[in-house]
A protein has these predicted regions:
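Mixed-charge interfacial surface used for oligomerization/domain docking
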Residues: 1, 7-165
Length: 165
């Protein structure tokens, strides 16, 4: 059976890991399908980009918009939870964009399976420390983005994936 997880990167990885565990424990196909559908509905993915340059190169935005956004230091804030890329806002500095991610996490209530995803973000460990009041540091996974997502997101992209309760 094919199930659309509406997820990517570590969000998808969490679903696969839990489904594999259920299969290993002897879960039936129906039980595993129900588990995957439940996890998919509870998976959240948010990210912030550090530059608009890669969006311009990939044809996702025009040159004028990229130039203006770069001049104003816009950092796009994205919600990928629905399986589509949705602009959830924009911030003017890196610090504000990371604070936006923290506010998203704080607004969710109880969360689990938190992963930080990044593309060579030098401040990833600092960000992990900042959110350790929300999820203990030893429960936070940090993962480098793959080539495809990293190509679109560009250097210093940083995001979070997690499950809501």
């Amino acid at each position: 059976k094919c199930i659309d997880s509406k997820s990517i990167t570590c969000g998808l990885g969490t679903i696969i890991r839990k489904a594999a565990g259920a299969a290993k424990d002897g879960g039936s196909m129906d039980e595993i399908v129900a588990l995957v559908e439940n996890l998919a509905s509870r998976t959240r993915i948010f990210a912030t980009l550090d530059t608009l340059e890669n969006l311009k190169k990939g044809g996702r935005i025009g040159g004028a918009k990229a130039m203006l956004g770069t001049m104003l230091q816009f950092k796009p804030c994205l919600d990928l939870s629905s399986g589509e890329v949705v602009e959830a806002g924009r911030q003017r500095t890196r610090k504000k964009s990371l604070n936006w991610l923290i506010e998203v996490l704080e607004s969710e209530g109880e969360i689990s399976e938190l992963s930080i995803i990044h593309g060579d973000a030098p401040d990833v460990e600092e960000f992990a420390t900042l959110i350790s009041d929300i999820v203990p540091r030893d429960q936070i996974r940090i993962n480098q983005l793959g080539a495809v997502i990293g190509t679109h997101g560009g250097p210093r992209v940083l995001g979070v994936t997690y499950l809501v309760q």
